[in-house]
């Protein structure tokens, strides 16, 4: 009887230890999964949302805009001559420039807006609170102003410029997030061709 009691207590202790290990494993897996999801949706250099997450934000903004007078504006921003900066001054300087551009863009937009790094030297800003194309242009000018001040490089101050394309969601066109981003990208290339 005592032997049976000891075995029962041992079995209970073993079961509790196994359950505790399972709970710890589940928590670890949840944390790992959260990390994987976060890494899949953000840019590792800047911590900004990436293209996938930005497209989700744009799609939500488009869907929400049908109920209000506010329309999403997408700005496609390309850092001018970034390849030559990267090639001549090195990748660490290029990374520092991209990080500073990300910081300045984040500071230049309203709290309701979102900035993402979608590739190399390309950024996208979404502002879902604009009520006219004129407000979109004002936002683009504010962003250009934020980038005008020199940035620190490993040879002194560097002046960085950018080309910006703007796309404003017109309700009657029923554009998708991908369409809106593509229109902004096309407008950016036109701006770049026109002389930065």
Model-derived features: where do they sit?
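PAS/GAF-family sensory domains
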Residues: 29-32, 36, 54, 76, ...
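Amphipathic HAMP/coiled-coil signal-transducing linker helices
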Residues: 31-49, 63
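Short, well-ordered beta-strand segments
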Residues: 75, 124, 165-167
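Cyclic nucleotide signaling catalytic output domains
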Residues: 115, 142, 156, 163-172, ...
